[in-house]
Amino acid sequence: MEVRHNWTHAQVRELMEMPFMDLLFEAQQVHRQYHPKNYVQVSTLLSIKTGACPEDCKYCPQSARYQTDVEKERLMEVERVLDAAQKAKNAGSTRFCMGAAWKNPKERDMPLLTDMIKGVKDMGLETCMTLGMLTPEQAKQLASAGLDYYNHNLDTSPEYYGNIITTRTYQDRLDTLSHVRDAGMKICSGGIIGMGESANDRAGLLVELANLPTHPESVPINMLVKVKGTPLETAEEVDPFDFIRLIAVARIMMPTSAVRLSAGRENMNEQMQTLCFMAGANSIFYGCKLLTTPNPSEDKDMQLFNKLGINSQQVSQKPDEITENELLDRVVESVAARPTKDDLFYDASL
C-alpha cells in the first residue's frame, strides 16, 4: 500500500462497504507494513483550562452556551501541570497532551504555555497541545518552545460541519493546521463519530484528512460521549461495527499515521477495543479522563494489553518509581452517562 493524497468519496465508500473480515485483514496488512506489530503508543491528556469556552460545538460540555455540570477553571499553574506530567510519565505515558477550552489562546498566556512545554520536554516526554485556533506567530512560538504535536480536529465533513459548529469555519481549522505544519510541528487531527452524520460524512472526514499535503502524524477517532445539557445528549448510538470499520479505513488511507482510540473508549468493552486494534488503531489515551469525560483506568488498559500481548511504547527516560495511582486530579469529574456493556457489543465470555 502506497501513501496517497488523492482519495475520492467513491473509493472510501467502497472500502467502508467491504465485507467486515476482509476489511480488517487488509487494514492489518497495511498496519504491519508501516508499524511494529503489537505495539501501542500511550498518551495522557490534561485539561489545563476548563469550561467557559465561547464556542458552540454541540458535542462539548465545556461550551459556556450549554447548562452542564462542568465548572469553569482558570489556566492551571505551571507547577501543577508539571506535577501531573511527572505522574503520567510514572504511569507509562510517552506523550503528555495539554488542552485548554479556548477559541484561541491570548497573548498574555503564551509565556505560561511555553514554560509548560519546556518543563514537560525536560522530563523526556513528547508534548502536545490543543488550544483552539492559532496565528502563524503563535504556532512559531509553540514550536520554538519545543512543542512536538498540535491537536486541531476537523470533527466531521465540510458538508455536515455547519450542523455542529457555527463559531468557526472549516477553513479556519484548515488554516490552523497549515500554520502548525509551516512552523515545523507535527499534526494531530481527526474527528468525532456519532453526531448524527451520515456514512458519506464519515467518508468525507477521512477524505479531508487523507488528502492534506502531508497526512497528520496522529489521527484520533473519537466516539461521541453524550453529555447531559449539550445539544447532542440524545444522539443515536454508534453501531460498534461501523466504528471499527472507520478505524480500518483510516488505517488503509493513512498508513503511516498513528490511529488513536480517543474519547468514547470508556464505553467500549474489551472485545470492541480488541477489534479496533486489529483494524489498525495503535495509540490510546491512558487512564483517568479525557478533558471532561471518562477514560478507562490504567489498570484496565494494562490488563487488556497483557491479554492481547500488546506492549505499550516506553518513555525515552526510565520512569521513576510509581508512588500514586491518581492522575490528572484537576480534571472535572465525569458528567457523561455511561451506556451498559450489553448496549455496545457482544460479550465474548458468554
Swiss-Prot record:
Annotated InterPro entries: Aldolase_TIM, BATS_dom, Biotin_synth/BioAB, Biotin_synthase, Elp3/MiaA/NifB-like_rSAM, rSAM
Cofactor remark from the record: Binds 1 [4Fe-4S] cluster. The cluster is coordinated with 3 cysteines and an exchangeable S-adenosyl-L-methionine.
Pfam family membership, one: Radical_SAM
GO-annotated molecular function: 2 iron, 2 sulfur cluster binding; 4 iron, 4 sulfur cluster binding; biotin synthase activity; iron ion binding
Biological or metabolic pathway of the protein: Cofactor biosynthesis; biotin biosynthesis; biotin from 7,8-diaminononanoate: step 2/2
Swiss-Prot/TrEMBL keywords: 2Fe-2S, 4Fe-4S, Biotin biosynthesis, Iron, Iron-sulfur, Metal-binding, S-adenosyl-L-methionine, Transferase
Reactions that this protein is recorded to catalyse: (4R,5S)-dethiobiotin + (sulfur carrier)-SH + 2 reduced [2Fe-2S]-[ferredoxin] + 2 S-adenosyl-L-methionine = (sulfur carrier)-H + biotin + 2 5'-deoxyadenosine + 2 L-methionine + 2 oxidized [2Fe-2S]-[ferredoxin]
EC number: 2.8.1.6
Residues that hold [2Fe-2S] cluster according to the record: 97, 128, 188, 260
Positions annotated to bind [4Fe-4S] cluster: 53, 57, 60
GO terms, biological process: biotin biosynthetic process
Cofactor section: [4Fe-4S] cluster; [2Fe-2S] cluster
Domain Radical SAM core: 38-256
UniProt record similarity statement: Belongs to the radical SAM superfamily. Biotin synthase family.
Quaternary structure and partners: Homodimer.
Function: Catalyzes the conversion of dethiobiotin (DTB) to biotin by the insertion of a sulfur atom into dethiobiotin via a radical-based mechanism.
PANTHER family, per the entry: BIOTIN SYNTHASE, BIOTIN SYNTHASE, MITOCHONDRIAL
Name by which UniProt lists this protein: Biotin synthase
Source organism of this protein record: Vibrio vulnificus (strain YJ016)
Gene giving rise to this polypeptide: bioB
